[in-house]
């Protein structure tokens, strides 16, 4: 199924692959953005959340549930201080939810949105007046969150390493511009940003954003962005010039050291490396820690160092 938002309504296509029949829910109440963001429920495929506004006034998250051939709304109780402009949850631990409001206020929840804590002493980038702002929780480090929005009189991007308790600027290399969306590779090695002035990328270790438009991509507003890991591609949506793909290295999402692909690097991965060497098993790129196209005792030593370093933090 596919959920989508349109000015004034939310549409659900229950069988998008086989037809265009849809179910519609018209906005109730007031205070919504022109194109308010949607967020899927991390546990229930029949549920999404829309940013309010509110059905009964105020500014809330509104839960939308598919029930038969209709969409049933439920206004969640927490009152945010302004129109909600961005929502996200951690892909590592989906009980951690994040919200930004129109004036740049940031909120964090540890219980799937039941209760919220507002970041004090911080005013983040404000929202676009009808499209919203952006939150990108890390795919690798719980608590690491990158946010973006209006950057004409302040920095457009900030980063937190503690679920938003504190933020620091993360805008080196970016011009004064509006950042509409941020997404990144599964390993966090590269972040991408869709902005008013074009597409940008931040490579881990380079410590600045770079313009990746090149000579062929359109000089236009880049409204939307999604990183598609299956094809190692950052997919940008532009204003009037269609969809443009930025293809990265096919090994960009390899988590070196995670030999058994369980998203955790530990002693089990060392055991697998030993077995690969002893029994001449098939080469796996995630076990080739030093990228010399072979797996040997050096990779075991390097993997041991990685594990010891993580335990020492």
Language model regions located:
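Beta-propeller blade termini and top-face loops
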Residues: 1-250
